[in-house]
Amino acid sequence: MMKIYRFLMVLGLLVWMAQNVSSQSRYDKDKLYNVFPAKVSNKVLGYDKGSSVILKSLSKDDQKQQWNINELSGSFRFVNVFEDKALRADVDHKALVVTEVNGSDEAQLWSIQETTNGVRLVPANTPSLMLVCQKDGRLQLMDRKKAEAMEASLFQIRVSAVPMPEGAGMAAREKVYWEDETRFEENKEVGH
């Protein structure tokens, strides 16, 4: 009886350790990343003018395809530190857009689900949807049950050749509001 008890204790400890190791962040806050559709190795998620996210040819000179990945309580925010923009799930139009980083916008949070062939990107606030890359290169949010069976829902996240710019940690920071009696001021700090 004592041997079974010890065996179960050791087994429980091993399972607990494995969960803790696997739950640790795998994205370095001081690096930039490119997000590739799994079947298209020379195109990455980026944006031009406006708010639509498009596939662009990989280029280290294009800052609008470089993403810093911030972990926030098990979810992730993809932030372009050069323009302080984040990927956002527009669930009403089932589209992927970029908007200014907003710490209270849950539509900017993503679940990154690992598979053997890549990752799947699921909006954290709408887990019934999943990001897919259509054959024509359009990116859209689709019903998760349908998308999970499609290769179009697989993406690769790779470290970019572009280094993180100095001071970018401050640019990616959410806006801070300070209370001054009945007034609120944005970034009420010296030099702002």
PLM features per residue range, with description:
Residues M1-L8:
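Bacterial N-terminal signal peptides that target proteins for export
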Residues Q24-H192:
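Lectin-like carbohydrate-binding module/patch detector with strong preference for beta-trefoil
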Residues Q19-S23:
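Sec/Tat signal peptide C-region and signal peptidase I cleavage site
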Residues M9-W16:
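Bacterial N-terminal signal peptides
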